[in-house]
Amino acid sequence: MKIQILGVARTGTTNLALSIEKEGYTTILEPYGVNPKKNKTALVEKICVKNISNQFPIDKFKSAYDFQLENIPTFDKTILLDRKNELEHWKSYLNLLKKYHKDPKTTHTIWYEDDITSDWDRKMRNDGFYEVFKLQKETIKKLSNEFKIPITYYEDLFSEDRMYSFETINKWDLDIDPFNVNEYLDPSKRYKQIGKRSQFI
């Protein structure tokens, strides 16, 4: 089975891809990101490709949406990921930008609410990143409508109600053990921590 995970940044795409990798899949993370990777999807039977919804081969397409119109049909299953709570999503996105600017290797580490300042929020908005964020979300919605693929939400996938999250995963009808994937996606693995960092210094 060939699976594509396509989501807005900070919707659990990486953890989901890694959980599927443990089910015997070859995993490719963001082949059209900062450092493009050669596309080997046609060479592997069990493969999971994770893409962010604004990434695409810029030498061949004008937009990520146009690219996915051709890309999605090449997979047996595409999972679309977003978040319901846009404010919390934007804060998480700000954290991603902050860590990436400081040290890209730290983007998948824990963070706290007080890590994000109003000055950083203002700077990222002024630099146009909020528009990028909104475009990612809009692309997911458009593709959901075009291909009639329901959007899976972060809040459901990492829900404290693990039976509900299991049912969410099971509905995808993938060639995986949904119990294993559900266990891997336990809410304790979320990057954002409760409380303030200053309390733990």
Description of each model-found segment:
Residues M1, Q68-E70, I201:
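Short, Lys/Arg-enriched, disordered terminal segments
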Residues M1-I47:
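PAPS-dependent sulfotransferase catalytic core
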Residues R10, L157-S159, Y184-L185:
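Short, surface-exposed acidic/glycine-rich loop or hinge patches that mediate macromolecular interfaces
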Residues E30, T152-Y154, F179:
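Residue-level detector of family-conserved "landmark" positions at structurally sensitive sites
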Residues G33, E155-L157, N182:
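Residue-level "edge-of-site" marker
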Residues V49, S53-I149, Y154-D175:
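PAPS-dependent sulfotransferase catalytic domain
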Residues F166-I201:
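C-terminal accessory extensions appended to soluble enzyme cores
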